């Protein structure tokens, strides 16, 4: 798979939804993990990230509690840390992975208990990643079979020996639409920025461009 320029890819995509990017720094000594959220409805757009230091993660919360209509599917922990393992997802499956791995189960075991989100007709995919202490990582997407709400398809991607200077990106959606088409194929391969600051800045810049 050819490497993409993640900035250009996201800038040209009107609505990728929620996205996860995992990369190995060019020096091979650090792993970068990024997560972003976008929303189309007022309820979806009414949220911000808040730290959860006691669990080594972050949660989403309403930017304006008075405007919160339905907390299901939009209020959750996108990031949690279990020992030296970092979990990032686009929904409450973060807690499922955390709980099941705490019991000795695997990333895949945990996600086999879950399915896509019940937001007909989009059936938003559940995207997840787990990054281990040795730098290896796994990603997953749980999605409907071309919009069939009675059929789940679970995909898992394993990166035991990531290459320095590159990463993988997955999002909930392929692009905007009605209904919104789910992401297709394996996570996209992209060139990693030089520093974590550049990595974070690039994702923030793209997110702000779509506001």
List each language-model region with its residue ranges.
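Conserved short alpha-helical segments that host acidic/polar catalytic motifs at enzyme active sites
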Residues: 1-210
């Amino acid at each position: 798979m050819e490497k993409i320029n993640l900035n250009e890819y996201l800038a040209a995509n009107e609505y990728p939804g929620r996205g996860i990017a995992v990369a190995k720094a060019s020096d091979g000594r650090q792993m970068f993990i990024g997560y972003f959220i976008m929303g189309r409805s007022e309820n979806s757009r009414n949220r911000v990230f808040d730290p959860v230091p006691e669990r080594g993660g972050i949660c989403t919360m309403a930017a304006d509690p008075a405007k919160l209509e339905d907390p299901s599917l939009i209020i959750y922990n996108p990031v949690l840390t279990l020992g030296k393992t970092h979990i990032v997802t686009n929904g409450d499956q973060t807690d499922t992975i955390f709980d099941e791995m705490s019991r000795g189960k695997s990333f895949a075991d945990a996600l086999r208990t879950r399915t896509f989100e019940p937001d007909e007709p989009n059936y938003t995919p559940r995207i997840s990643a787990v990054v281990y202490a040795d730098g290896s990582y796994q990603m997953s997407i749980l999605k409907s079979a071309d919009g069939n709400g009675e059929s789940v398809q679970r995909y898992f991607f394993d990166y035991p020996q990531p290459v320095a200077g590159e990463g993988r990106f997955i999002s909930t959606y392929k692009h905007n639409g009605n209904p919104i088409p789910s992401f297709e194929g394996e996570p996209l391969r992209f060139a990693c920025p030089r520093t974590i600051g550049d990595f974070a800045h690039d994702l923030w810049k793209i997110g702000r461009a779509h506001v």
